[in-house]
Amino acid sequence: AVVNVNFGEGQCYSGQVATPYPGYTPMIVKFDEHQKMPTTRIEYSYYLMAVDAGLQMMPSRLLEGEQTAHFLTERFDRRNGKKVHIQTLAAMNPPADSYEALFEAACRIGVPPGELRQLFRLMVLNVLGGNVDDHNKNFSFLMGDDGRWHVAPAYDYTFSVDPDAPYYVNRHSMTINNRTEGITAADLLE
């Protein structure tokens, strides 16, 4: 759900409203609905690990109740009450299914070279953390005020291996060195 939240007042309203009221922050809420796994708590712990590892992510938190914990993250596509122009890798290159294609797209649109480290960190963390939901809609680019494209903060970084699913479901969506499983350090560095 998209909402605008004022934590000081304990208030929120629909994020579909174009401009948030002063003191409200545009956020995305993921509700604690999974019966078998504490998915929102897992996503929050992955957020903390990723930030500690130097990955740029939007500020996030858990909203805990007696039996629930909802995950909230600030929206990166809003700045000062206005929409920020973004494009996913899927929008720029629909058939993109590899990290190589991600890096090629970033270079093609002129992302500053230093920001490619963000993409590399995310690739490594997706492999190490078991985030196999790394499809081309989970990588975005922002148009800066300077008119240049920039790597968007990472999002949807969480453990996504399903222990009850067939093995082929638990492969990475994007290939690394033509592999979706059994990815090695050599594959990451090639």
Language model segments and positions:
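Conserved ATP-binding subdomain of kinase catalytic cores across diverse folds
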Residues: A1-A96
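Generic recognition of well-ordered alpha-helical segments
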Residues: T88, Y157-P163, T175, D187
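Conserved kinase catalytic-core segment
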Residues: Q35-V51, D97-P163
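Short beta-alpha connecting loops at secondary-structure transitions
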Residues: Y168-N177
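Cytochrome P450 core scaffold surrounding the K-helix E-X-X-R motif
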Residues: K83, P163-A165
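Mobile late-domain/C-terminal helix-loop "cap" segments
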Residues: N177-E190
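Structural beta-strand/beta-sheet cores of well-ordered domains, especially the beta-sheet scaffolds
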Residues: A1, T25-M27, M58, A69-E74, ...
